[in-house]
Design a protein with these regions (language model features):
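Basic, polyanion-binding surface patches
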Residues: 1-83, 171-172, 179-184
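Netrin-like (NTR/C345C) domain of secreted extracellular proteins
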Residues: 64-187
Length: 187
């Protein structure tokens, strides 16, 4: 698990077995490792595969992200849908914005409480044009974001080590990592 700077994310066609039907778009991603948050990795850059049922992986919309990558044999894979956009604070440390949506708020409770941050103007989430103003307000609560035009600017945030703990205790555990039971897991 690491903070990475996007170098490239390109779609590819994976080689599949005769009776295998892939329901996801496949991407090869290359990132510069800015900060290792958990695990071991010796390189300055990392390459991994990402699969997304909705098309282009959302993490690729951001220059920097906290990414959750696992090894399977000799290949590295992104843990499907698991990421946080992150931004460098004036102190130089990496932080993610406040929670996006009710589920993220629930998952973070007691682990990564968002607090006011002195963000730069590049700390925002782009808003999809098809989202209604009601959808935007529901996803980007006014205590954590300021919506201006097509951007939700961050007002609060949490450090990356706390955000890692959120995923570790929730979805990654459910997927059988960190002492969880993958047999009970679902996406």
């Amino acid at each position: 698990m690491f903070v990475g700077e996007k170098l490239s994310v390109e779609q590819f066609g994976p080689v599949l077995g005769k009776d295998v039907l892939l329901m996801d778009a496949a991407f090869k991603a290359k990132y510069r490792v800015e900060q290792l948050v958990y695990g071991e990795y010796d390189g300055d850059t990392i390459e991994f595969e990402a699969y997304d049922h909705h098309g282009v992986p959302p993490f690729s919309r951001f220059p920097h992200a906290l990414l959750f990558v696992s090894r399977d044999g000799n290949r590295l894979y992104h843990q499907k849908y698991q990421y946080y956009p992150v931004f460098r604070a004036p102190s130089g440390a990496w932080f993610g914005c406040g929670p996006v949506g009710e589920r993220d708020s629930e998952d973070r409770r007691g682990i990564a409480e968002a607090r006011p941050m002195p963000w730069d103007s590049d700390a925002y989430h782009p808003l999809k044009p098809e989202w209604s103003s009601k959808d935007r307000r529901k996803l980007f609560a006014s205590e954590h974001f300021r919506i201006d035009g097509d951007k939700a600017y961050c007002l609060t945030g949490s450090p990356v080590h706390e955000l890692f703990e959120v995923k570790k205790r929730t979805v990654l555990k459910a997927r059988g990592m960190f002492g969880g039971d993958a047999a009970k897991a679902g996406d």
